[in-house]
């Protein structure tokens, strides 16, 4: 084939003129040059068929025996070898059309093959999605990334990131990169520390989030900031949390109120779901639920609203009850909660034993329940309740024959969480639609909480949030009654992000910290640079930072965060492919004035 001028799309060079997955019936008769990996190779009755794969898909090559030199060359190929091939596009016969491939109506009859790189035997097959240990997958991640599903996840992530950028820049957001080397903050998760060669004995830290920088950008007069921000936290892995590093869609705006931010975020998620996913949003605008309400109704501040169960408060029904377990938990600060499972009252004893076991795992002393059977109510607490209490329960909860009601009693927060855990436990009884995205905002978080261990008032979440009512609330309200402009966005039981309207006034900040037991000197020592900035004209501002990794997980139906990250660490925070973390040389340590002293058990 004659050499064509080089083009920006990577075609018309010596390797390819076309992409494998974009050849179709319209390509019939064309002379093409394609390149990629040998997905499969088969010898069928003297014909060699090669499935050639590039990032667009797969195309079938046919090597005829009369093309003797190329036939012999094809016989030497291994799976995952890299080749380029020239040939003519022909239509397949009707009986050999492969409808699963975009190029399934055609094949390329090969005139020549060039081996660019022959592959050694593989540690696991790429073409077949057979189960492979995670250790092997991570060690050979470059092979694992060739597998179709993982490959598509990474491409999807790229497209999603591009869509986020376009959505936000169209709304006049400015993308600004913040420092990766910054100062350490002992609050929150552990920092990753970076020793300074130029300043012996001192350390930088990788940012846990660009929080302070993005607020300083508001002070600097940038009205709308965003960044696809890398964040670093030295914390243990979970299925939805990668150890060490993760990415967030970091957003901050000045001169806004809480509702302004909600409108922009809801619009962004709606745009992403409608344009990049087959999933559907259950309710738009997203429902807003106060922290107190969400704990009372769902027992969690990250509820899965698809679960058709709701916790109900029945405390007042047992104020004068003869059943002391309930009656003793009717005073302020305690409660009696109930949850009805409709039509589940005739389950086996094993069902209730397993439920009680789960309740104990959640911290309960047991699990009280009543089955409403044809022959009358049954269960371990029936004998302790009066007929009037039973009737009041049935009326309050809408109970009919065939239902079962579960109870929890104790301190309000603990009881809510136990009942919320049981709600999640019973979720498996219901066919939840994985294509339904049930977003919600959790709002009106308490500003302060009582720290039982230290016997003092402490911040409940973000100490830099603006209290609702501002200075007046701090000066006139009981601390535990003060609410903050803090909010979480949740989808299907997964917290995507926390955010807040920030406290931009030093006087309010000093007062809030004073309530939590900090002196002005302590606040200045820890956060002096922020307060100094706020003293020079800080606008009202607020923000949020949805997790990019978790968002991709939800939209791609993945249960493990490592399935949406190109090069993740394992559960032990190790990169098996790059052998990190690793030892360094004595000279490197000497330059940094560092000496290693391992714990006794590791020596």
From Swiss-Prot:
Q: Single GO cellular component annotation?
A: cytoplasm
**InterPro entries this protein is in?**
Aa-tRNA-synt_II (IPR004364), aa-tRNA-synth_II (IPR006195), aa-tRNA-synth_II/BPL/LPL (IPR045864), Asp-tRNA-ligase_1 (IPR004524), Asp-tRNA-ligase_1_N (IPR047089), Asp/Asn-tRNA-synth_IIb (IPR002312), AspRS_core (IPR047090), GAD-like_sf (IPR004115)
What are the binding positions for L-aspartate in this chain? Answer: 187, 233, 461, 502
SUPFAM superfamilies linked to this entry: Class II aaRS and biotin synthetases, GAD domain-like, Nucleic acid-binding proteins
Q: PROSITE patterns per the record?
A: AA_TRNA_LIGASE_II
Q: What is its main location?
A: cytoplasm
The answer to whether UniProt assigns keyword Transmembrane to this entry is no
Signal peptide positions (record): none
What are the recorded Gene Ontology BP terms? aspartyl-tRNA aminoacylation
Which residue ranges are recorded for the region named Aspartate? 211-214
Q: Which residues bind ATP?
A: 233-235, 495, 547-550
> A Gene Ontology molecular-function term?
ATP binding
Classify the source by domain of life: Bacteria
Where is this gene product found?
Cytoplasm
The record lists the catalysed reaction(s) as: tRNA(Asx) + L-aspartate + ATP = L-aspartyl-tRNA(Asx) + AMP + diphosphate
Which residues make up the annotated site Important for tRNA non-discrimination? 44
Keywords carried by this UniProt record: Aminoacyl-tRNA synthetase, ATP-binding, Cytoplasm, Ligase, Nucleotide-binding, Protein biosynthesis
Q: What is its EC number?
A: 6.1.1.23
Q: Which HAMAP family does the annotation name? A: Asp_tRNA_synth_type1
**Function of the molecule:** Aspartyl-tRNA synthetase with relaxed tRNA specificity since it is able to aspartylate not only its cognate tRNA(Asp) but also tRNA(Asn). Reaction proceeds in two steps: L-aspartate is first activated by ATP to form Asp-AMP and then transferred to the acceptor end of tRNA(Asp/Asn).
What family is this protein classified in? Belongs to the class-II aminoacyl-tRNA synthetase family. Type 1 subfamily.
Task: Please give the subunit comment from the record.
Answer: Homodimer.
NCBIfam families, A to Z: aspS_bact, PRK00476.1
Q: What is this protein called?
A: Aspartate--tRNA(Asp/Asn) ligase
């Amino acid at each position: 084939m004659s050499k064509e001028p080089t083009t920006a799309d990577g075609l018309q060079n010596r390797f390819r003129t076309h992409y494998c997955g974009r050849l179709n019936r319209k390509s019939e008769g064309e002379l093409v040059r394609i390149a990629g990996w040998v997905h499969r190779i088969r010898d069928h009755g003297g014909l060699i068929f090669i499935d050639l794969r590039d990032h667009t898909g797969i195309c079938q090559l046919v090597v005829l025996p009369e093309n003797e030199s190329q036939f012999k060359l094809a016989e030497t190929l291994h799976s995952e070898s890299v080749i380029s091939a020239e040939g003519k596009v022909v239509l397949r016969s009707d009986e050999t059309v492969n409808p699963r491939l975009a190029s399934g109506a055609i094949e390329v009859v090969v005139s020549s093959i060039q081996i660019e790189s022959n592959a050694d035997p593989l540690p696991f097959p790429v073409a077949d999605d057979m189960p492979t240990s995670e250790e092997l997958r991570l060690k050979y991640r470059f092979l694992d990334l060739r597998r179709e599903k993982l490959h598509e996840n990474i491409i999807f992530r790229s497209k999603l990131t591009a869509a986020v950028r376009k959505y936000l820049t169209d709304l006049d957001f400015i993308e600004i990169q913040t420092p990766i080397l910054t100062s350490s903050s002992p609050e929150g998760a552990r920092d990753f520390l970076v020793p300074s060669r130029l300043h012996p004995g001192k350390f930088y830290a990788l940012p846990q989030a660009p929080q302070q920088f993005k607020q300083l950008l508001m002070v600097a007069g940038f009205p709308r900031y965003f960044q696809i921000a890398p964040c670093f936290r030295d914390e243990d892995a979970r299925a939805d949390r990668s150890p060490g590093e993760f990415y967030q869609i970091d957003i901050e705006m000045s001169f806004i109120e809480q509702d302004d931010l909600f409108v922009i975020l809801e619009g962004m998620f709606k745009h992403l779901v409608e344009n990049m996913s087959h999933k559907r949003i259950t309710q738009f605008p997203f429902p807003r639920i106060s922290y107190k309400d969400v704990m009372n109704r769902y027992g969690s501040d990250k509820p899965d609203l698809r679960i058709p169960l709701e916790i109900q408060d029945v405390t007042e029904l047992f104020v004068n009850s003869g059943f002391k377990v309930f009656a003793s938990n009717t005073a302020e600060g305690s409660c009696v909660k109930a949850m009805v499972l409709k039509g589940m009252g005739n389950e086996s004893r094993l069902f209730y034993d397993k439920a009680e076991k789960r309740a104990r795992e959640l911290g309960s002393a047991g699990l009280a329940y009543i089955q409403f059977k044809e022959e009358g109510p049954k269960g371990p607490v029936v004998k302790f309740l009066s007929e009037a209490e039973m009737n009041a329960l049935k009326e309050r909860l809408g109970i009919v024959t065939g239902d079962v009601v579960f109870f929890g009693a104790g301190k309000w927060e603990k009881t809510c969480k136990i009942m919320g855990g049981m709600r999640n436990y019973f979720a498996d009884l219901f066919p939840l639609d994985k294509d339904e995205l049930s977003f919600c905002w959790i709002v009106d978080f308490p500003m302060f909480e009582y720290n039982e261990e230290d016997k003092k008032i402490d911040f409940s979440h973000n100490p830099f949030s603006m209290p609702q009512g501002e200075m007046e609330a701090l000066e006139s309200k009981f601390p535990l009654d003060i609410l903050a402009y803090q909010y979480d966005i949740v989808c299907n039981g997964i917290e995507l992000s926390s955010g807040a309207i920030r406290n931009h006034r030093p006087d309010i900040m000093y007062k809030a910290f004073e309530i939590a037991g900090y002196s002005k000197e302590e606040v200045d020592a820890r956060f002096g640079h922020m307060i100094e900035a706020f003293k020079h004209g800080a606008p009202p501002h607020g923000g949020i930072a949805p997790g990019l990794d978790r968002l991709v997980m939800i939209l791609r139906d993945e249960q493990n965060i490592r399935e949406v990250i190109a090069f993740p660490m394992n559960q032990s925070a190790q990169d098996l492919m790059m052998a990190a973390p690793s030892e360094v040389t004595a000279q490197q340590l000497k330059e940094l004035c560092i000496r290693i002293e391992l714990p006794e058990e590791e020596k």
